[in-house]
Every structure is written in structure tokens, then in C-alpha cells.
């Protein structure tokens, strides 16, 4: 994920993955899966279910994802902004020193 290209879906899924939050995934068919998100890309999710089996689920088949607890997915945005600001300040300091 590029630093300047953060989107809500990636922030949400990545925070669920990093915190290993249990989720219930509701599929369009009405089926429900419970487990932990292990990874994702633009089109799929890998979920480890309660019986320790991994399933690859296509995002277009998902209706919604319900986390078992609230998550702070905006923390990634704030961390990214702090890192970008620090990097810019460091670059500015280096540019001033070289003059």
C-alpha cells in the first residue's frame, strides 16, 4: 500500500489482521464464516476459521464484516501522517545543512 494512497477498506482489514481480531463474515449467499483475517489483496481475503482451516474468500461474495470488538483503524492514518511529517522535517534539515 503506497503511503499517499490509504483507503478505508485496506485500513480496516489491515487493522483487523494486525490485531488478530475475531470477525464474522457475512456472505451474499447468507452463509456466515467466523475466524481471523490472515491476509488480503484487492480481490480476496484469507481467513483462518475456528477449526484452524484457511479459506480464500472472494471479496465480491462478501456482504459485510463484523469485528468482535471495536478497532481503531484510523491509528494507521495518524501514524502515517506523523512519519511523513518527521520525514519531511528531516529532509528539510538535510537540505538546509547542505546549503
UniProtKB/Swiss-Prot annotation:
GO cellular component, one term: cytosol
TM segment ranges: none
Name the UniProt record assigns to this protein: RNA-binding protein Hfq
Record PANTHER family: RNA-BINDING PROTEIN HFQ
Oligomer and partners: Homohexamer.
Primary gene name: hfq
Similarity remark: Belongs to the Hfq family.
GO MF term set: RNA binding
Function noted in UniProt: RNA chaperone that binds small regulatory RNA (sRNAs) and mRNAs to facilitate mRNA translational regulation in response to envelope stress, environmental stress and changes in metabolite concentrations. Also binds with high specificity to tRNAs.
Organism encoding this protein: Caldicellulosiruptor saccharolyticus (strain ATCC 43494 / DSM 8903 / Tp8T 6331)
Keywords per UniProt: RNA-binding, Stress response
A Pfam family the protein falls into: Hfq
Annotated segments matching region Disordered: 77-99
GO biological process: regulation of DNA-templated transcription; regulation of RNA stability; regulation of translation, ncRNA-mediated
Residue ranges of every copy of the Sm domain listed in the record: 10-71
Amino acid at each position: 500500500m503506497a503511503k499517499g494512497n490509504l483507503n478505508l477498506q485496506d485500513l480496516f482489514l489491515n487493522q483487523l489482521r494486525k490485531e488478530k481480531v475475531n470477525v464474522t463474515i457475512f456472505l451474499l449467499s447468507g452463509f456466515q464464516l467466523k475466524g481471523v483475517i490472515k491476509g488480503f489483496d484487492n480481490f480476496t481475503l484469507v481467513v483462518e476459521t475456528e477449526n484452524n482451516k484457511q479459506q480464500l474468500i472472494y471479496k465480491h461474495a462478501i456482504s459485510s464484516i463484523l469485528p468482535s470488538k471495536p478497532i481503531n483503524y484510523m491509528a494507521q492514518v495518524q501514524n502515517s501522517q506523523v512519519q511523513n511529517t518527521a520525514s519531511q522535517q528531516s529532509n528539510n534539515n538535510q537540505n538546509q545543512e547542505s546549503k
